[in-house]
A protein has these predicted regions:
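NTP-dependent nucleotidyl-transfer catalytic core
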Residues: 1-197, 202-205, 212-217, 230
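Conserved nucleotide- and phosphate/pyrophosphate-binding catalytic cores
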Residues: 210-440
């Protein structure tokens, strides 16, 4: 398995730069290698841009190597200028501590840390007590300013109006020091990262060679970019987070369902652990009948399962089916809860009201599906209202046997306007009444 790992990464489009390919391949074939990937805790969650790196680490682990996942508590205090047009806001220590704890937990969902099969580290543990003079003597003297100025990220910032601070200019030295420390203490021989990190990776390789006289390796993958050219997961608009409290599993699932047909094969290869033969089969099937969206469904299901687990992936799939015209009657309780988290909702009538039959008209108004009782009656007369997927007529009442899994009744007006009656409302930050869910 190890001998073909590089070939598998290349087949997935996950090799952009690397140190000598033959030497790297030979080292991987010779035995287990410790390989590291780092994430700076600039937020309290990782995003899908980080997911590629974690999945590459997972591929190395599945091939018998040892991942070293680094949460950059030290480098996060400085900020990486790579791919940025302006200075980062510096975070305080308490915020960084909370962010590091959060992203460590997310890393543990992708990698197996049992019995030392993977290692989780924080670079603040070996950086916090290093004095400035020690750092300048043991790291700074091995790196020339010429080398630092040659890095694309530095050149781009120097050419900008804002320029670059000494803090961010020094970032590559801190990351190079990480590689040196990890090599000396954990035997790390390979660093991986996105192509925007290649300059930082090379700085670490050079430092290990100069200080320890050892040949170590680096590998980067091409950046996945959004239509506006920004890095996936790092756009200035709505990010797609791995934390379900920031991006619900349903919205995470829908992100992948909305992938452009032209990107399906590439995303299946990079954002899932499916074998490349299965990826190619799905891509070919999708190309023949893109309207079936088999590729997007496989992508959404696999990516959501990896990040949120099988139950959440299934609930997101069922919620999607409901919100795009499917019947909620056969859906599970988790799927209905997911739907209730995405659309307007109103309290379910009491048991006594349900026993007597609750008038649907005021419920449509309360749920935001009608502006008035008159509007609600007109919608019913026009046959535009459904209860649990079944079109209803004027005079319809909500009764106990309409309640799904003891908690939910799904209402729909027209094709896209949904609301849910919920037995115990309780959720804060609910969508505003009258919002719509648009199909991809």
């Amino acid at each position: 398995m190890t001998a073909t790992l590089l070939e598998d990464l290349e087949a997935r489009g996950l090799v952009h730069n690397s140190t000598d390919r033959d030497h790297l391949g030979a080292r991987l074939a010779a035995g287990p290698v410790s390989v590291y990937y780092g994430c700076d805790p600039s937020a309290d969650s990782l995003h899908i841009g980080n997911l590629i790196g974690l999945l590459v680490l997972r591929r190395f682990q599945d091939a018998g190597h040892r991942p070293v996942a680094l949460a950059g508590g030290a480098t996060g205090m400085v900020g990486d200028p790579s791919g940025r047009s302006e200075e980062r806001n510096l975070l305080d220590a308490d915020t960084l501590d909370a962010n590091v704890a959060a992203i460590k937990a997310q890393m543990a969902r992708i990698l197996d840390f049992d019995d030392g099969r993977a290692v989780l580290v924080d670079n603040r543990d070996w950086t916090a007590d290093v004095t400035l003079l020690d750092f300048m003597r043991h790291v700074g003297k091995h790196v020339t300013v010429n080398q630092m100025l040659a890095r694309e990220s530095v050149r781009a910032r120097l050419a900008s109006e804002q320029g670059i601070s000494y803090t961010e200019f020094s970032y590559m030295l801190l990351q190079a020091h990480d590689y040196l420390w990890l090599n000396e203490n954990l035997g790390v021989e390979l660093q991986i990262g996105g192509s925007d990190q290649w300059g930082n990776i090379v700085s670490g390789i050079d430092l290990v060679r100069r200080v320890r006289g050892r040949a170590v390796h680096g590998l980067s993958w091409p950046l996945i970019t959004a239509p506006d050219g920004s890095k996936v997961g790092k756009t200035t608009g709505a990010r797609v987070w791995l934390d379900p409290a920031k991006t619900t599993p349903y919205r995470f699932y829908q992100h992948w369902m909305q992938v452009d047909d032209r990107d399906v094969r590439d995303y299946l290869a990079k954002f899932t652990l499916l074998p490349t033969a299965e990826v190619d089969e799905l891509a070919a099937d999708h190309q023949e009948a893109p309207e079936r969206r088999r590729g997007q469904r496989a992508l959404a299901g696999e990516a959501t399962r990896l990040v949120h687990g099988q139950a959440a992936a299934r609930a997101a799939e069922q919620a999607s089916e409901i919100l795009f015209g499917g019947s909620p009657v056969e859906a599970g309780a988790a799927a209905l809860a997911a739907v209730a988290g995405e659309v307007p909702r109103a309290p379910l009538p009491s048991d006594a009201e349900l026993a007597a039959g609750a008038d649907l008209v005021p419920l449509l108004v309360e749920a935001g599906l009608a502006s008035s009782k008159g509007d609600a009656r007109r919608s019913l007369e026009q046959g535009a209202v459904s209860v649990n997927g079944d079109r209803v007529e004027p005079g319809r009442e909500i009764r106990a046997d309409d309640v799904l899994h003891g908690r939910h009744v799904v209402l729909r007006k027209g094709k896209k306007s949904y609301a849910v009656l919920v037995r115990d409302e309780g959720e804060e930050n609910s969508p505003k009444p009258g919002s719509q869910v648009d199909a991809p």
